[in-house]
């Protein structure tokens, strides 16, 4: 496998409970490096743009409202097979179905407030990373 980069968001439910450090520890324990990170508050426009792929889905407005409800931590992660590895560390979207020890099993409050987002494919990561980070903000 090759070294990849992936994108992560620590969502408002997790930042509100001061879980950034605990989530970062799980990321690093999995062998992924955090090569860019910043804590921000998304505007409605940013959230709508980022989640635009879901615009026609019934949950879109609730998702946007949730994502602007508090600070988030956006990150670029790097490592061997980073996309698949981070998806394993995150666990299933529904925390009730997530494996023990995953971020969502340990920290998520619900399927909506599931603590983290991660890119699902190289193409997605290639779009999501520059949405929040310029090249000079990523320190490999």
From Swiss-Prot:
Catalytic activity: a 2'-deoxyribonucleoside 5'-diphosphate + ATP = a 2'-deoxyribonucleoside 5'-triphosphate + ADP; a ribonucleoside 5'-diphosphate + ATP = a ribonucleoside 5'-triphosphate + ADP
GO biological process: CTP biosynthetic process; GTP biosynthetic process; UTP biosynthetic process
Single GO MF descriptor: metal ion binding
Function, as annotated: Major role in the synthesis of nucleoside triphosphates other than ATP. The ATP gamma phosphate is transferred to the NDP beta phosphate via a ping-pong mechanism, using a phosphorylated active-site intermediate.
NCBIfam families: PRK00668.1
PANTHER family: NUCLEOSIDE DIPHOSPHATE KINASE (PTHR46161), NUCLEOSIDE DIPHOSPHATE KINASE DDB_G0292928-RELATED (PTHR46161:SF3)
EC number(s) reported in the record: 2.7.4.6
Known partners and oligomeric status: Homotetramer.
Similarity comment text for this entry: Belongs to the NDK family.
Compartments it resides in: Cytoplasm
Keywords: ATP-binding, Cytoplasm, Kinase, Magnesium, Metal-binding, Nucleotide metabolism, Nucleotide-binding, Phosphoprotein, Transferase
GO CC, one annotated term: cytoplasm
Cofactor(s) of this protein: Mg(2+)
Protein name as it appears in the record: Nucleoside diphosphate kinase
Major localization listed first in the record, in broad terms: cytoplasm
Annotated residues for binding of ATP: 11, 59, 87, 93, 104, 114
UniProt xrefs under CDD domains: NDPk_I
Matching SUPFAM superfamilies: Nucleoside diphosphate kinase, NDK
Active site: 117
Keyword Kinase among UniProt keywords: yes
Disulphide bridges: none
């Amino acid at each position: 496998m090759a070294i990849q980069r992936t994108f992560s968001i620590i969502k408002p439910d997790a930042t509100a409970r001061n879980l950034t450090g605990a989530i970062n520890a799980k990321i690093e324990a999995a062998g992924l490096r955090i090569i860019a990170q910043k804590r921000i508050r998304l505007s409605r426009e940013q959230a709508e743009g980022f989640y635009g792929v879901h615009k026609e889905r019934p949950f879109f407005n609730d998702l946007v409202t949730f994502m602007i409800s508090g600070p988030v931590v956006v990150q670029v992660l790097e490592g061997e097979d980073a996309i698949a590895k981070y998806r394993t560390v995150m666990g299933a979207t529904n925390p009730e179905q997530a494996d023990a020890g995953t971020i969502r099993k340990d920290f998520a409050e619900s399927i909506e407030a599931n603590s983290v987002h991660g890119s699902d494919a190289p193409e997605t990561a290639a779009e999501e990373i520059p949405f929040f980070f310029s090249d000079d903000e990523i320190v490999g």
